[in-house]
Curated annotation (Swiss-Prot):
Name of the gene encoding the protein in the UniProt record: tauB
PROSITE patterns from the UniProt entry: ABC_TRANSPORTER_1, ABC_TRANSPORTER_2, TAUB
A Pfam match: ABC_tran
Origin: domain of life: Bacteria
Listed name of the protein: Taurine import ATP-binding protein TauB
Cross-referenced InterPro entries: AAA+_ATPase, ABC_transporter-like_ATP-bd, ABC_transporter-like_CS, ABC_transporter_ATP-bind, P-loop_NTPase
Length: 268
């Protein structure tokens, strides 16, 4: 399989006053199958817009998305989405949520049950499978969301700030789980985050986007995701290279934010 191709994507939103906003301009990326890539940038750089175009929720103004050599039109089961809030069915049990996709596709329970149980084991929720969603903590709910996404067996997993609302310790545990699932499943993962450290930990490839219009500013190839599969993430962060790249990116984004503020003040 050839993976995911983002070809010259531009996105313009028309405004009620007759004007428009250029959210993305000529974004191109080739993402190989099994790659984990993080996308980072200041607010307004088009990160989520790009993810929604890849998911098929938005049609770009220009450009195309191709998955395994076929042009993407609208959402389908080949691309799974995990949101900041799990978008789970609170009245259903954990197991019912995880098995929702296969059930909606008309699969027989005998065909999907073993995989659902395996996924519940992987995310550490087998003992909670009969619990209702509202009985779970935020971190546990995000584990359910991950398992539900994987139960549909997508080629690509799209994650829009899925760990942003979690406390620091739970977030670190979830970061380790994401890396474990990446290695175990071989899925392509694209993760949007506002956290520089998270982007470094969860991206063997890291894309920094610049705003107005949203575009690729810089790309990094990093060893930390591979290291984090087997190592304690706190130890990974002690790598001098980790600190060096973190400071470089923080400075880069700071400068972008300063430029945005300058533009805003000049137009006021």
């Amino acid at each position: 399989m050839t993976g995911l191709a983002i070809r010259n994507i531009s996105m313009r939103f028309d405004l009620p006053n007759g004007g428009s906003v250029q959210a993305l301009q000529d974004v191109s990326l080739d993402i190989k199958q099994g790659e984990i890539m993080s996308v980072l940038g200041p607010s307004g750089c088009g990160k989520t817009t790009l993810l929604n175009i890849v998911a098929g929720f938005l049609a770009p103004t220009d450009g195309v998305i191709e998955l395994n050599g076929h042009e993407v039109h609208g959402p389908n089961a080949e691309r799974g989405m995990v949101f900041q809030k799990g978008a789970l069915f609170e009245w259903m049990s954990v197991r019912e949520n995880v098995s929702f996709g296969p059930r909606m596709k008309g699969e027989r329970a005998s065909d999907y049950s073993a995989n659902v149980d395996h996924l519940l084991d992987v995310v550490g929720l087998q003992d909670f499978k009969e619990k209702a969603i509202y009985e779970l903590s935020g971190g546990m709910q995000q584990r359910v969301a991950l398992a539900r996404c994987l139960a549909n067996d997508p080629d690509v997993i799209l994650m829009d700030e899925p760990l942003g609302a979690l406390d620091a310790l739970t977030r670190e545990k979830m970061q380790s789980l994401v890396l474990k699932l990446w290695k175990e499943t071989g899925k392509t993962i694209i993760l949007i985050t506002h956290s520089v450290e998270e982007a470094l930990l969860l991206g063997e490839r890291l894309i920094v986007m610049a705003p107005r219009p949203g575009r690729i500013h810089k790309e990094y190839r990093l060893p930390f995701a591979d290291e984090g599969v087997d190592a304690d993430l706190r130890e990974v962060k002690k790598n001098p290279k980790f600190a060096e790249v973190r400071e470089e990116i923080l400075g880069m984004i700071w400068d972008m934010e300063e430029e945005i503020m300058g533009r805003t003040e000049a137009s006021a």
